[in-house]
Curated annotation (Swiss-Prot):
This is Phospholipase A2 inhibitor. It is found in: Secreted. Disulfide bonds join C83-C160, C138-C152. One of its GO terms (cellular component) is extracellular region. Homotrimer; non-covalently linked. It comes from Bothrops jararacussu. InterPro entries: C-type_lectin-like, C-type_lectin-like/link_sf, C-type_lectin_CS, CTDL_fold. One of its GO terms (molecular function) is phospholipase A2 inhibitor activity. It comes from the Eukaryota. Belongs to the alpha-type phospholipase A2 inhibitor family. Residues 46-161 form the C-type lectin domain.
Amino acid sequence: MRLILLSGLLLLGIFLANGDEVDPDRKLLNSLIDALMHLQREFANLKGSFLIVHKARSFGSGSERMYVTNKEIKNFEALRQICEQADGHIPSPQLENQNKAFANVLERHGKEAYLVVGDSANFTNWAAGEPNKAAGACVKADTHGSWHSASCDDNLLVVCEFYFML
């Protein structure tokens, strides 16, 4: 009996003495778990911050779409490429408040910009005498948000539209 007790104590002593030693794979796994938990917290914080900014921008403009310029002046094809590379779109206001948000950007910069008008558009804001096919195949908005026919070769303010499905 004493032999069993001594053997048990000896094993316990060895276990306690080596208790700080951790299997390297287990140590790596624990490190990865900690890193993943940290990334999850950071992602949640980033998502929360993004939603706050998006809601504030939407509240200020009355639109779920954001219209952003890089202040460059380009033709229609260059605009299309720039917006596509930025994961955005050429502006296509579908509602009056969206057109107003777009026009606010143009007014701030004192420039005109391209937009796209769909064939089935429920909302339009053509200026008097427009559309005028003779002026060009593209459409531009002035600083008041009125739409005009334009040449696709005109160099206008680069504005891209971003919208989010939340």
